């Protein structure tokens, strides 16, 4: 069966505000763009910034659509095991964090995993870039983006889609930070 008809050249989510994508003002600006002006002072964090948290992720996984929730749930389960068994600092669940607390946590994070969900690209990818954390993500070798943001072992660290090398990747990068 030929699936070429399903392919399309499109813009990706990274071309919109990824610094405060879920803020109230950003939501309003999307609804009434001609009334609320857009001025964003993005504060980037250097990757060399001292970081105390080995692994951190916050994501929803209790979703109605298993096709969206599966990869998130599987990643969270495996991360919890890896964090516990390797005595790493970090968390995959916890109380809701304010935007300020969340950004502070991202700035303190060494490895920011990013599961697939609604698609391959996610807000978390850009949060890692902005806050200088190492982006750990399923291999994106199958996808070409513009701008080319997914360059293996340069802009992100890939792991196998079946998670078979996840523990090894995390262990290696924690030991060789």
What does each model-found stretch correspond to?
Residues 129-130:
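Short alpha-helix at the nucleotide-sugar/activated-sugar donor binding site of glycosyltransferases
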Residues 157-177:
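C-terminal "capping" alpha-helix adjacent to the active site of nucleotide-linked donor transferases
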Residues 1-123, 134-152:
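Nucleotide-sugar donor-binding catalytic core of glycosyltransferases
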């Amino acid at each position: 069966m030929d699936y070429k008809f399903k392919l399309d050249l499109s813009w990706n989510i990274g071309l919109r505000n990824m610094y405060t994508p879920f803020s109230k003002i950003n939501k309003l600006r999307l609804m009434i763009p001609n009334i609320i002006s857009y001025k964003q002072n993005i504060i980037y964090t250097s990757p060399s910034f001292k970081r105390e948290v080995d692994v951190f992720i916050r994501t929803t996984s209790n979703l109605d659509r298993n096709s969206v929730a599966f990869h998130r749930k599987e990643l969270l389960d495996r991360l919890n095991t890896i964090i516990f068994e390797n005595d790493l600092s970090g968390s995959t669940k916890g109380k809701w964090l304010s935007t300020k607390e969340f950004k502070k946590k991202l700035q303190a994070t060494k490895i920011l995993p990013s599961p697939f969900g609604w698609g391959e690209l996610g807000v978390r990818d850009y949060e890692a870039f902005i806050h200088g954390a190492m982006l750990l993500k399923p291999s994106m070798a199958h996808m070409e983006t513009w701008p080319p943001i997914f360059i293996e072992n340069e802009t992100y660290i890939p792991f196998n889609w079946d998670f078979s090398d996840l523990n090894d990747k995390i262990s290696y990068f924690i030991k060789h930070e």
